[in-house]
């Protein structure tokens, strides 16, 4: 199965191509241009370098938020435009769930994206069981205090809002985590 994944939720645009469980291509671009200028050339380059066309894609995975409203619209519209002519399946992917899926081990991962004005889009997951502990939501950084303090397992903050959270809470409770590469889309 060929899966083309698109991420336009933040200021960095990303495109990846998976063939079954194997990553064939991955690129992220934060070049100062808008996603409307960069996304389609990124997809075109991806397909050409992998020797594929849109007809070879079995599934499009697209970031469905939370994130930049305009960025999400660009990604969703692009994927809809590519998928529609061949009625190719599309799978919406939570930004925060995708961040969590890149991490493995024991403990809790709290995904945080900067939503500005001292807020983060956040969700939390148990790493061992992949159970969701907090739903996707925009929260004031201070509103996460109860969750952080009650967390009994090692707590890992990930995402571009991790620093905002890290600076608010006891350093003994928190770890910053780097992603583990894996390909799992359900």
Give residue ranges: language-model regions:
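N-terminal beta-alpha supersecondary unit
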Residues: 1-64
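Residues at secondary-structure transition points
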Residues: 30-38, 69-73, 77, 94
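Phosphate-handling active-site elements
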Residues: 48-55, 84-93
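Single conserved hydrophobic/aromatic residue that forms the stacking wall/gate
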Residues: 174-186
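DPxDG-like acidic metal-binding loop motif
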Residues: 61-89
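Surface "functional belts" at beta-alpha junctions
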Residues: 22, 89-173, 177
């Amino acid at each position: 199965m060929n899966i083309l994944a698109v991420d336009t939720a933040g200021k960095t645009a990303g495109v990846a191509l998976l063939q079954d469980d194997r990553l064939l291509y991955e690129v992220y671009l934060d070049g100062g241009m808008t996603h409307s200028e960069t996304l389609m050339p990124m997809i075109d380059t991806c397909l050409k370098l992998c020797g594929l066309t849109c007809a070879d894609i079995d599934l499009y995975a697209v970031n469905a938020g939370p994130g930049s409203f305009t960025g999400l619209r660009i990604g969703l519209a692009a994927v809809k435009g590519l998928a529609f002519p061949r009625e190719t399946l599309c799978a919406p992917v939570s930004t925060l769930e995708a961040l969590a899926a890149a991490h493995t081990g024991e403990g809790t991962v709290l995904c945080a994206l900067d939503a500005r004005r001292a807020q983060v889009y956040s969700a939390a997951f148990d790493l061992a069981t992949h159970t969701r502990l907090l739903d996707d939501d925009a929260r004031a950084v201070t509103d996460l205090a109860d969750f952080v303090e009650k967390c009994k397992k090692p707590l890992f903050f990930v995402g571009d809002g991790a620093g905002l959270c890290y600076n608010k809470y006891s350093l003994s409770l928190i770890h910053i985590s780097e992603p583990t590469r894996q390909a799992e889309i359900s």
